[in-house]
Amino acid sequence: MAAAGDVILEDVPGSVNLFNTLQDQITKVTAHVQDLTQKVRSGIYNTDKGLSFLELKDQLLLFYLQDLTHLMLEKTNGKSIKGNPGILRLVELRTVLEKMRPIDQKLKYQIDKLVKAAVTGSLGENDPLRFKPNPQNLMSKLSEPDERESDSGEEGAEGGVAKKPQSKVKRYIPPRLAPVHYDDTEAEREHRIVERAKKLALSSSTIRELKEQYSDAPEEIREGRAYHMMRHDKEEQHRINHEESMMVRLNMTRKEKARKKRVLSMTSQLNSLTHFSDISALTGGEGRAEDMVPSMKKSKKGPKKSKKKKGFSRRRH
């Protein structure tokens, strides 16, 4: 019993200080609440358009403090709080407040912005909602009269009366491009043709077969289809997929039709078995630069002569 009495005596000074601090805080809170109540009743603070979420939160906190104060009063008077209904109400209110905390965190930005707008009467300078498109910026700020108005102004100046321009919209004048002569020397042209011939030679069938012959990489087994046919089939499949997906028919140009006809005819021609001129650009073979690149034959177009049917003419005697 003596040990319990010593513990109680040690806690008495701390308890007295807590009660004094609590009394001071209660006095300040009471004065603040009375001041707010008076301002709300007088119409200084308009609460008609308030947030229902904050109102609910304030009501729950008020009920929580009431029940907590009632339990403290019961314990101060030395009564038992076992089976007191206030405990169940505290647990329920505490659970609801804990469930409202994530919602409060999500609405914190909107609530702070609305409270600031209600206090200051306007949004902040750095508010993202202020940075919106301004249609006035689309108007032209150039003050230059049109040609008609300038002409009328000159006529008025000659007569002694000058008219002010009514419109300040500048007319768009496209830039004038002066033709420039294309300087291309014969050496540059030959060099460009040789480079093109080298690219064609590197992608030729002869170089590809030599690479496959002396390479250590595993050989790819193909089902007897030529490279140009595989490339043609791939392009044709891509074309078909595009037409089916876009629901449109693609027209073939004359160049594409000629290339398709040439590719299909290469499978039945045996004249190019001993033709090695496609790698002459790599071996340094002699010849003109024009001969290194296969040229496309252009069909000559000319006016068609109308053929008249020959018939027997009657001779008049």
Curated annotation (Swiss-Prot):
The keyword Nucleus applies. GO terms for biological process: maturation of SSU-rRNA from tricistronic rRNA transcript (SSU-rRNA, 5.8S rRNA, LSU-rRNA); regulation of translation; ribosomal small subunit biogenesis. It is found in: Nucleus; Nucleus, Nucleolus; Chromosome, Centromere; Cytoplasm. It holds the Pfam family Sas10_Utp3. GO terms for cellular component: axon; chromosome, centromeric region; cytoplasm; dendrite; filopodium; nucleolus; small-subunit processome. Part of the small subunit (SSU) processome, composed of more than 70 proteins and the RNA chaperone small nucleolar RNA (snoRNA) U3. Belongs to the SAS10 family. This is Neuroguidin-A. It comes from Xenopus laevis (African clawed frog).
